[in-house]
Amino acid sequence: MPPTVNMGIPGASRTALGSVAGDVTGKRVLLAEPRGYCAGVDRAVETVERALEKHGAPIYVRHEIVHNRYVVDTLAKAGAIFVEQTDEVPEGAIVVFSAHGVAPTVHEEAAARHLRTIDATCPLVTKVHNEAKRFARDDYDILLVGHEGHEEVVGTAGEAPDHVQVVDNPDAVDKVTVRDPNKVIWLSQTTLSVDETMETVRRLREKFPTLQDPPSDDICYATQNRQVAVKAMAPECELVIVVGSKNSSNSVRLVEVALGAGASAAHLVDYADDIDPAWFDGVTTVGVTSGASVPEILVRGVLDRLAEHGYDVVQPVTTANETLVFALPREIRPARQ
């Protein structure tokens, strides 16, 4: 886990809120930091942008490059064509694989169609893929904690379909069976709620006491950091607004975390126009954060809308500083001078 992650929630809350618990008694906004783009999303979006610059339109992208409407619409206007399946891409064309990763069968399909591929899979997702392959080679049963049908889960499970079982939530544990309880390991989708994942793992361990942990934390640093920041500010908020799309797992989890941490209400919005003024009735403090696939321009739009309703004092709640940067895929890296 990168050193920017602060999982000590109580301490994080005191530190973060120490600077905002002053004499402000009127309407205010608590603005979570960190929020927005993570290193994997930044890399994926730049990958499509660079591919368009280098090769020109159209560039095909298998699935949404990241789960955000604004980002996808912006790239589509620039010449990206988003498809659901590889066979929708013309033979010989360029296709970018999304940040969520793909199964080996997708690479095989692309090769059969002579597609030129650029893999924008987040390196932290690739890490989970490699773990799945490693433990499948050792003939483990792999319990993949994640949301059934999510692109990332489909891709990871596809690395070892005969060894992976998806465990969607804590209640799904009762249905899990394994061949050898002494050779079972859990892995996870990178964008889950930390708390719900740990509850699922707790139940799995009750059923399989020798359950092994992944070699390193699978839930990504950015997912954890954003949840920590929301937990720090939510107890002070009557309302939390999470900027993000409905199909963004990590954004949806932030709404759940806010409610679980004490916010009276929490809502997910794509744009400022999605905000219902009725939400502000009786509200003094509004918390604002955004999912890991959300550009800052959308957060600024929400802050402007809040200011129109009198919430013009913005106070940061900082629980971590993120500096991680991932290298671009080699196919679109700038040539060395």
UniProtKB/Swiss-Prot annotation:
Pathway note: Isoprenoid biosynthesis; dimethylallyl diphosphate biosynthesis; dimethylallyl diphosphate from (2E)-4-hydroxy-3-methylbutenyl diphosphate: step 1/1; Isoprenoid biosynthesis; isopentenyl diphosphate biosynthesis via DXP pathway; isopentenyl diphosphate from 1-deoxy-D-xylulose 5-phosphate: step 6/6
Residues at the catalytic site: 152 (proton donor)
Membrane-spanning parts: none
InterPro entries for the chain: LytB/IspH
Residues engaged in binding [4Fe-4S] cluster: 38, 122, 220
Residues holding isopentenyl diphosphate: 67, 100, 150, 248-250, 293
Needed cofactors: [4Fe-4S] cluster
EC number: 1.17.7.4
Domain of life: Bacteria
Residues annotated to bind (2E)-4-hydroxy-3-methylbut-2-enyl diphosphate: 67, 100, 150, 190, 248-250, 293
Cofactor note: Binds 1 [4Fe-4S] cluster per subunit.
UniProt keyword annotations, A-Z: 4Fe-4S, Iron, Iron-sulfur, Isoprene biosynthesis, Metal-binding, Oxidoreductase
CDD domains: lytB_ispH
Function text: Catalyzes the conversion of 1-hydroxy-2-methyl-2-(E)-butenyl 4-diphosphate (HMBPP) into a mixture of isopentenyl diphosphate (IPP) and dimethylallyl diphosphate (DMAPP). Acts in the terminal step of the DOXP/MEP pathway for isoprenoid precursor biosynthesis.
Family label: Belongs to the IspH family.
Protein name stated in the entry: 4-hydroxy-3-methylbut-2-enyl diphosphate reductase
Organism: Mycolicibacterium vanbaalenii (strain DSM 7251 / JCM 13017 / BCRC 16820 / KCTC 9966 / NRRL B-24157 / PYR-1)
